[in-house]
Amino acid sequence: MSQETDNKRLVVLVPNDAVFNPRRAYTSEDEAWKSYLENPLTAATKAMMSINGDEESAAAIGLLYDYYKVPREKRLLSLNKINEGHEDQDKRNCLPANETPSNLSTGENRVQVLKTVPVNLSLNNDTVESSNREKYTTSLSESPQPAPASAVTVVKAEEFTPVFMAPSVPYRSDGEEPRGVIFEQTHFGVHSITTHSDYLKDDQRSTPDSTYNESFKETTEKYRTPSVGTEEFLYEQTASSTFQYTLEATKSLRQKQGEGPMTYLNKGQFYAITLSETGANKCFRHPISKVRSVIMVVFSEDKNRDEQLKYWKYWHSRQHTAKQRVLDIADYKESFNTIGNIEEIAYNAVSFTWDVNEEAKIFITVNCLSTDFSSQKGVKGLPLMIQIDTYSYNNRSNKPIHRAYCQIKVFCDKGAERKIRDEERKQNRKKGKSQAAQAQCNNSADGKLSAVPLQKKSDITFFKTMTDLDVQPVLFIPDVHFGNLQRTGQVFYNTDDDIEGGVLVKRLLRPVDEDYGPPAPKQMKEGSRKVLLYVRKETDEVFDALMLKYPTVKGLLEAISEKYGIPVEKIVKIYKKSKKGILVNMDDNIIEHYSNEDTFILNVESLAEQGYKITLTEI
């Protein structure tokens, strides 16, 4: 019995009357303690303290760590439950004989456990004089029972009223006696002396949730602290020069004053576009730095929306396939390592996300000529623009945070290089004439002639920033393909709930018979009503022709049933397998728009009593 008593130590907590410094404001006691004890107490830390002779200091701090690991609601237990659960008579003997636990908690039904921040935490050792121990223990009663020095450890703590928060335990009045809280310490004893002032200086104290916002008051950018949730963070940039875009293509030598840069491109050739951030906070790594950019090919600003749609529809009607796009991107590894979430949101636009902390690069090609928008020969080509809109990824707004453009003229068969050479020859002729005129003026006494400024050849074209961010760009989506784009989630209506990452895509609602140039050939209209498929089994060498009366799944099932004698009601699944090995459910859109006159291998698989599964593998 004596051995068990020696192994059990007691901790007495005595609240102090000292007023806590009002500058130190915490929102809760748990948050304040975590600001002191934010690093885990590892075995290596305990070993280092043991080497320095602080074995019991480590044990005391470990007690605090264990205490604050328990959720707060589980620590605030009623005193009656604690009194019923404690059967150890040695612990009760530490209380004065004339005072019981029930008297100790008069006017209060909760145990006050390490209330708020223990600023002056002192743990006495075996060498502390008995007079000092009696000074602390007399706060419990006028006639306390003596306790061995090795069995009692006294903890002194200050308490204060947290700012912006009512205290969870009533504070004692002026004439009220200080209360003591007893803890049982069974595994270790503490005999070293420590103070919390060693961990935090008065001049350097700050609240646990203090931030560095004060140091960025003068900047235009707005950043939230790291404690802000991902959904609440808004990457805001107000400076117009925040982003910089470059096109790796030769710039025209004949740049017009007041207009954007002009670049010559070849149709079908891929060019690299580099996107980067050049704001004032370039040196800082933003915690949430994803943005969404949309690269699009549009007409100049002098063309209104109806005119642009008229030109696009005329161009689309002259293409050899309805799938032909205005703008395509290359699947280069160099590009896909810097961008993500690529979406072909329109025939003339591509959307993707990228990290402003890193430089992004994407390779694009333009599939239309500047002369493709008129049926007349010898007409000067229309200038086009490559426009880049960048949106804040988390800000659900259809207004970009940055917009820039570059004018382009698209040629065929290396026409861009020939155009540059022609401009170089013209410039050299002007240079020769200018030098001759300058020499004549120098011969005269007072004749002066300013030299004509000459443009230098540049293989990099910088985009020009646009100040108008309110005008919505015109995105071209043919009506015949809108249903398929909507099914795949690439088109969103103009509503507040259907804006993703700040990118707004509008459906171009136009009557089918509206005149946007020459009408499409009648063969294309008739071909959309009937679909012809060439199908053979894997063991066959000759294809069978399946003529679908209706371009739907039902029409396909009826054609298969008629050709191969399989009842329609027995076919439970029908799939299409692409050349890349992608297996998809066959639907009406695939049959109507993407399967006419295609060749397939038919595979019929029996599913026991359920029916048949049919797979059409594209070849």
Swiss-Prot record:
One GO BP: bicellular tight junction assembly
Protein purpose: Transcription factor playing an important role in primary neurulation and in epithelial development. Binds directly to the consensus DNA sequence 5'-AACCGGTT-3' acting as an activator and repressor on distinct target genes.
UniProt keywords, alphabetically: Activator, DNA-binding, Membrane, Nucleus, Transcription, Transcription regulation
Protein's organism: Xenopus tropicalis
Protein name (record): Grainyhead-like protein 2 homolog
Grh/CP2 DB domain span: 239-477
PROSITE patterns reported in the protein's UniProt record: GRH_CP2_DB (PS51968)
Key word Iron present: no
Annotated stretches, region: Transcription activation: 1-90
Additional notes on this entry: GRHL genes (GRHL1, GRHL2 and GRHL3) show a paradoxal lack of redundancy despite their extensive sequence identity in the DNA-binding and protein dimerization domains and the fact that the core consensus DNA binding sites are identical. They have related but remarkably different functions during embryogenesis because of their differential spatiotemporal expression patterns during development.
A single GO cellular-component term on record: cell-cell junction
Subcellular location, record wording: Nucleus; Membrane
UniProt site positions, description: Important for activation of transcription: 418
Membership in a protein family: Belongs to the grh/CP2 family. Grainyhead subfamily.
Biased segments, Polar residues type: 99-108
Phosphoprotein found in the keyword field: no
